[in-house]
Amino acid sequence: MSTSGTTKGIPIPLNIFKRKSIPFGRISRVTPKPEQLLHPFYRPGNVSSLGLCMKEGKPALLDSKSIIPSIVQNSKTGNPVLANCSLAFSSVQGVSTWLKQYENLRETRTTPFSTIPFPDLNRYLTSLPKSKVEIIEKAYTNLINNDGSHISKGIILELVHELSSDFELAVFSENILIFFLNDKVSKRSELACVLEAAFDLLDTHIDQPKTIYKFLMAFFAKYFEVPVQTDTDLNTLMVKLLMKLENKFHLESMYSKMVPELTEALFSFYTREGNLHEANIAINDLIKKGFIPKSEDIENYLTLINTKYPGHNSQDYMWRLFHIAHFEGLIQSSDHPNLLKFLVQNCRHREEIETVFTIVAKNKNSKILLEHLTAPVIDSISNMKMHRVPKSSLLSDYYKMMKFAFNNELSHQLKLLLLQGYITFGNFSMSAKIIEDNHLNLTVDIANKLIKIIKHNNKLFKGIDCPGFSEEALALFLECYIKPFEDELNQHSKKWLIRQQHYCK
């Protein structure tokens, strides 16, 4: 099923829970297998699937555009690389089998999710018996009286050495770490001291993964209390600690024995610290185990993705979708407006955004989602590389869905957004219909806004004879809905309207 040409590929980890780098490579353009696709939400519609199976020559989905993130093999090295691929086939043979495999695979990824029962992390901070607290406090006071310091890695390690050597006291290294977190830490630099001490103690005193896991629960309880600052790099210290944990105990993954509550805390930590790679690994582990992170952490994660990959180029689109590749099951049942907004903003083809429309229409909270998605949908359609007539058709599909969801009772703001959308796409017939059918009361401010949109897109409106999109349709719209405000328009709008009326004559 290969086609000619080449496309660049990006090296990715062989295993998302490992961190081995792979050399950069180039790959032959091939149709990826269903299991190689990493697109988190696109599904071919019934019409597209039928057309794919019936088309002679070289059938394709998404107009053969290379917009599907996929893991494929480098034809020269055999190593896996991440690349934007197209769903184009060399012939119709085998297409129906490919589609069936693709659909079956997607069905297995839409399993139900559970909400994580988030515990009170503070109980890990206060878990030490009073008798142990008194022993550690006394030893600490004696130590700082001699040293003059308050908290440092050296003091923590010295206390561990002093107290753990007395077996009758039964004070362990993790007790001392938690003591400092609960009673002594109030800023990030002190959190760093405790992490550094834990890192060293992994070599000498900590002999079970669960000891570190318990410490980390207490650490995060304090971390979420401490004011956010950028003067101390906790991220690097955390990564080094967990890598050391993984290597010491020969774990397949540092997450393999973690409870979901701890993985969620790590996910939240990495999103706050700006570590997208580790946050991606953490959330993939949660989703793989059937758990949904907190809504605010998902939103922070999406913001982080956009911060790292803000561009409108194919590479940034690919990386943004890659980082939510495992969200498929979550997306199908999600009622988080910002997650659906993220999907809309990363649609580059009409069939992608039509898939999002289907997801929203099936959602029990579709009205809430539609209220949040209307402006992003119009922006996304506007940015697609296609003629304004099919753009307007897409907006009409969305409008029909809105009318059904709201039983034709749209808010003034939604009506106005739809009107501005149709004006942007130059469909003056539908613009008039929005006004008339929805009894939209225009004002001079709205008229000025519409003129500004028309002026910005004026070159696109010329030379189109399609009904509703022509210059005659524009002239009629201006005459009926804008001219009544002529005397009240701002200076720029009034001058433009006069010139336009003169031109139309």
Curated annotation (Swiss-Prot):
GO molecular function: translation regulator activity
Keyword Flavoprotein: no
Entry keyword annotation includes Iron-sulfur: no
Entry keywords, A to Z: Mitochondrion, Transit peptide, Translation regulation
Subcellular location: Mitochondrion
GO CC annotations on file: mitochondrion
Transit peptide feature, positions: 1-30
Purpose of the protein: Required for translation of the mitochondrial OLI1 transcript encoding subunit 9 of mitochondrial ATP synthase.
Family per similarity comment: Belongs to the AEP1 family.
Protein name, as recorded: ATPase expression protein 1, mitochondrial
Source species: Candida glabrata (strain ATCC 2001 / BCRC 20586 / JCM 3761 / NBRC 0622 / NRRL Y-65 / CBS 138)
Lineage: Eukaryota, Fungi, Dikarya, Ascomycota, Saccharomycotina
Gene behind this protein: AEP1
